[in-house]
Amino acid sequence: MTIAQEPTALNFECETGNYHTFCPISCVAWLYQKIEDSFFLVIGTKTCGYFLQNAMGVMIFAEPRYAMAELEEGDISAQLNDYAELKRLCEQIKRDRNPSVIVWIGTCTTEIIKMDLEGLAPKLEGEIGIPIVVARANGLDYAFTQGEDTVLAAMAHRCPDKAPVAEAEKNERNAVQKLLNFGKKKELVAQEESEYVDHPPLVLFGSLPDPVVTQLTLELKKQGIKVSGWLPAKRFTELPVLEEGYYVAGVNPFLSRTATTLMRRRKCKLIGAPFPIGPDGTRAWIEKICSVFGITPKGLDEREAQIWAGLEDYVKLIRGKSVFFMGDNLLEVSLARFLVRCGMTVQEVGIPYMDKRYQAAELAMLEKACQEMGVPSPKMVEKPDNYNQVQRIYDLKPDLVITGMAHANPLEARGINTKWSVEFTFAQIHGFTNARDILELVTRPLRRNNNLKDLGWDKLVREEAKI
């Protein structure tokens, strides 16, 4: 158990550590599944290919909708024509897969050799007749989740700027509504349309699994709010319309570049809300959207209380315990806020990069949660130095460390409970109903160790026998 100290304001520090994270080209792993009519072409070296092959775990026989354009010595020494080579590959992709969009993912090497992908794409797009989106998701980013941010920022430029007039185009674009209205009579659909409050169009951005998209869309529908579209959509042809003055809201804390693009280039209005992670975050996210549209939220108190009651069997395992975030995927602030609400003390939040404007509502909510729960506010460390962090872990002795994969086993060998931060990226953690999945991940190492203690296995490392 930890002794609660006087709550204090958030303390921000910045160290000069290296970034310990996956390469952002790993965003291909979930984006190619999300955008069903896409093809991702990663332009890089053999190293990028090995990483993708290991990270994805997809056999070549499965014919996945991504490929590796491997740069050779001829490319780097400018003996080969970049345009001719990329044209050959894209024509082959068109012939074999015929996607609605080809996404070129630039890497460190294309940056270093100054390959002008943005200049090549429009000309080639005109020749092959397929849109080509260029995203520089290279290893020069702070966190691997920013690969998605780069791709969505590039996709935002391709969203139509006028609502469709033709009926056929309307049907093609309203995919979310068609999914929700599947199998219903026209009269029922018309009746449900009348339930929505009159408000400006709202577009949500962030790549989430389809069940979570449906859940969040329905939660807003209960408040009379209609979601005009999602970025990214299931299909490239269904990208949402973005006219000047449209409202946009993010669902992930690592999408600051996309938010900036939507505001500056597409002249949209950003709703600065906390993110819908955990019951408290989901409630605050819905409340903020309602307040912007002048709607009084209904039934959120009961909904949140009901979810917390269902989480009690997990919450009692971590209440009073301490957690330390080493920093990996930019979800740290949202997870820290949720765990404080669960009764944990967050000792430190390491984060590779902090956009204080985009995460302002989340930071304010974390500070408020610490005050209301009577626990000290965590130290916020941007770009943490791992050597210093390990020393602080030895001093603070947290009950759990949430860390990148590289440090998990060394810390476990020293008797420190760890959880891989990458698992929170791939798990369904958004919305009211998925809060249980977050606690399932957080409590797993603690439950495992309790089970091992019951068996009499207290130590991971075998001690030397004394003869």
UniProtKB/Swiss-Prot annotation:
Signal peptide: none
Reactions accelerated catalytically: chlorophyllide a + oxidized 2[4Fe-4S]-[ferredoxin] + 2 ADP + 2 phosphate = protochlorophyllide a + reduced 2[4Fe-4S]-[ferredoxin] + 2 ATP + 2 H2O
Molecular functions (GO terms): 4 iron, 4 sulfur cluster binding; ATP binding; metal ion binding; oxidoreductase activity, acting on iron-sulfur proteins as donors; oxidoreductase activity, acting on the CH-CH group of donors, iron-sulfur protein as acceptor
Superkingdom of origin organism: Bacteria
Entries under InterPro entries matching the protein: LIPOR_BchN/ChlN, Nase/OxRdtase_comp1, Protochl_reductN
Pathway assignment: Porphyrin-containing compound metabolism; chlorophyll biosynthesis (light-independent)
Annotated residues for binding of [4Fe-4S] cluster: 23, 48, 108
EC number(s) reported in the record: 1.3.7.7
GO process annotations (BP): light-independent chlorophyll biosynthetic process; photosynthesis, dark reaction
Cofactor(s) needed: [4Fe-4S] cluster
Pfam families per the UniProt record, alphabetical: Oxidored_nitro
UniProtKB keywords: 4Fe-4S, ATP-binding, Chlorophyll biosynthesis, Iron, Iron-sulfur, Metal-binding, Nucleotide-binding, Oxidoreductase, Photosynthesis
SUPFAM superfamilies: Helical backbone' metal receptor
Cofactor note (record): Binds 1 [4Fe-4S] cluster per heterodimer. The cluster is bound at the heterodimer interface by residues from both subunits.
Database matches in NCBIfam families: DPOR_bchN, PRK02842.1
Subunit structure: Protochlorophyllide reductase is composed of three subunits; ChlL, ChlN and ChlB. Forms a heterotetramer of two ChlB and two ChlN subunits.
PANTHER family: LIGHT-INDEPENDENT PROTOCHLOROPHYLLIDE REDUCTASE SUBUNIT N
Family listed: Belongs to the BchN/ChlN family.
Purpose: Component of the dark-operative protochlorophyllide reductase (DPOR) that uses Mg-ATP and reduced ferredoxin to reduce ring D of protochlorophyllide (Pchlide) to form chlorophyllide a (Chlide). This reaction is light-independent. The NB-protein (ChlN-ChlB) is the catalytic component of the complex.
UniProt name for this protein: Light-independent protochlorophyllide reductase subunit N
Gene field: chlN
